[in-house]
Amino acid sequence: GTGKSTLLNIISGLIKESSGQVLLNKHNLSNLAEHRRTQIVSRVFQDPSLGTCPSMTVRENLSLALNKGKLLNLRKCLRYKRDFLENLLEGVSLDLKKYLDVQVKFLSGGQRQSLSLIMSCLTNPSVLLLDEHTAALDPKTSNEVIELTNKIVREKNITTLMVTHNLKHALHYGDRLIMLHKGEVVLDVK
């Protein structure tokens, strides 16, 4: 009810802002074509099924993300990207590497959310929006996904906007904390 998801929807271009502008490095994102905006802004939803195709394998989902959603070159992408995908998953704590050829619907919630996160970062977006991306996970898995998130965004230097009700995560991982109440900023701490 405070406008958090609405704010993310506006930034990602899912809904049009009623007033004002969405600026990134002084460039108005609202004026960009949808395909260009999706290259700049990526998003991880609370429900990982919104960012993945559950009936496809982990490898196919990653290949689709690398191909920016085009099925056209999927076979070619699968063939040439095999080593890249396996290396990408090396060190992921939820062990996605051994599940490359398993349909996403058979993965745990943490594995699906990790996959969704990795897919969102494959095209090196400038901004990553995280919408309660660990809310549905148990505390241990939530911490693992947060650690993976932190590792990826730091390695790739991605500006991240995380919506969370977990104050511990916000304080520990955030460089800046903004609290909203009824659509207004009531706290802004760096």
Predicted regions and their residues:
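Q-loop/switch helix immediately C-terminal to the Walker
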Residues: 56-68
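H-loop/switch region of ABC-family ATPase nucleotide-binding domains
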Residues: 164-165
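Catalytic Walker B motif of ABC-type/P-loop ATPase nucleotide-binding domains
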Residues: 128-131
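Helix-to-loop junction immediately C-terminal to a conserved catalytic motif
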Residues: 12
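ABC ATPase NBD coupling module
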Residues: 28-42, 78
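Conserved ABC transporter NBD signature motif
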Residues: 20-27
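Helix N-cap at the start of a conserved alpha-helix in ABC-type nucleotide-binding domains
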Residues: 139-141
